[in-house]
């Protein structure tokens, strides 16, 4: 019986913690959602520009290295 309890107790604690987390969570209002969406979009654009400029810099370097053979 003790082996069963030792296997079930962590599951019970996890379930209690999960229920507590779901009860504390709230759905974002329109203003908060818009703010998160805009910041995420800005992050995507910035990462895209960084990738573009890295590619732009390394294309000539790669051509110099490969072209010298």
UniProtKB/Swiss-Prot annotation:
GO terms for molecular function: protein transmembrane transporter activity. Residues 1-32 are cytoplasmic. The keyword Transmembrane helix applies. The keyword S-adenosyl-L-methionine does not apply. It is a single-pass membrane protein. The modification N-acetylmethionine is found at residue 1. Pfam families: SecE. Belongs to the SecE/SEC61-gamma family. Heterotrimeric complex composed of SEC61-alpha, SEC61-beta and SEC61-gamma. Necessary for protein translocation in the endoplasmic reticulum. This is Protein transport protein Sec61 subunit gamma-3.
């Amino acid at each position: 019986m003790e082996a069963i309890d030792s296997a079930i107790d962590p599951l019970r604690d996890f379930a209690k913690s999960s229920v507590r987390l779901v009860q504390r969570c709230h759905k974002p209002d329109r203003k908060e959602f818009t703010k998160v969406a805009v910041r995420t979009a800005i992050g995507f654009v910035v990462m895209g520009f960084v990738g573009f400029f890295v590619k732009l810099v390394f294309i000539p370097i790669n051509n110099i290295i490969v072209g010298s053979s």
